[in-house]
Amino acid sequence: MSAPAQNNAEVPTFKLVLVGDGGTGKTTFVKRHLTGEFEKKYIATIGVEVHPLSFYTNFGEIKFDVWDTAGQEKFGGLRDGYYINAQCAIIMFDVTSRITYKNVPNWHRDLVRVCENIPIVLCGNKVDVKERKVKAKTITFHRKKNLQYYDISAKSNYNFEKPFLWLARKLAGNPQLEFVASPALAPPEVQVDEQLMHQYQQEMDQATALPLPDEDDADL
């Protein structure tokens, strides 16, 4: 990427790669941030769109250059050029599709092969859809690999900021960091059931307290 414009020189900027199976909602998710959508750039050589997502914290502005694959993952894995120099990542799956969760270890493997020790958030998208197939008790991969996990709903903006806040705190080495202003987000296309979201959060908290199952370890 070209050097940032002079007025952005002071803003800490981090390359964030967004990975996961096709159709899990990665592009929908990144497009929610309207400024990033307006300022995105296409890098033809590797077929990605880079969305600069700015967030304002109690310690100043922070920017994530979010690399979105433009659907290449449908044709197999991504090239190393996509991952090189990534400083953080979001792995996304669809809670209505078990196979997308089953493929998470493959995405994680490809990512850490190139990037090694970077902070990673695992996101289960589409929690607004009533027919949830991937339940809290089966979501254990993040615990085995020391990742953060959030339920999200890109279309409703539910938990949109959570992955970015967690990554910002890790990258800044500051757990006190907070977002002080919300970015302009696209209006929700769907509404989430607040009660159901609360129930999902409780189920996730309970599942996290349970010992890890060991039957999957050989695969992961």
UniProtKB/Swiss-Prot annotation:
TM region positions: none
Gene3D superfamilies with a match to the protein in the record: P-loop containing nucleotide triphosphate hydrolases (3.40.50.300)
Positions carrying Phosphoserine: 2
Keyword Cell membrane belongs to the record: no
Positions of the Small GTPase Ran-type domain: 10-174
Compartments where found: Nucleus
Region Switch-I, annotated ranges: 40-48
GO cellular component: cytoplasm; nucleus
Induction of synthesis: GSP2 expression exhibits carbon source dependency.
Classification via InterPro entries: P-loop_NTPase, Ran_GTPase, Small_GTP-bd, Small_GTPase
In-chain residues carrying the UniProt-annotated modification N-acetylserine: 2
Entry superkingdom: Eukaryota
Region (Switch-II): 71-87
Known partners and oligomeric status: Found in a nuclear export complex with RanGTP, exportin and pre-miRNA.
General function of this protein: GTP-binding protein involved in nucleocytoplasmic transport. Required for the import of protein into the nucleus and also for RNA export. Not essential for cell viability.
UniProt miscellaneous comment: Present with 2460 molecules/cell in log phase SD medium.
NCBIfam families: small_GTP
Protein name, entry field: GTP-binding nuclear protein GSP2/CNR2
Gene this chain is encoded by: GSP2
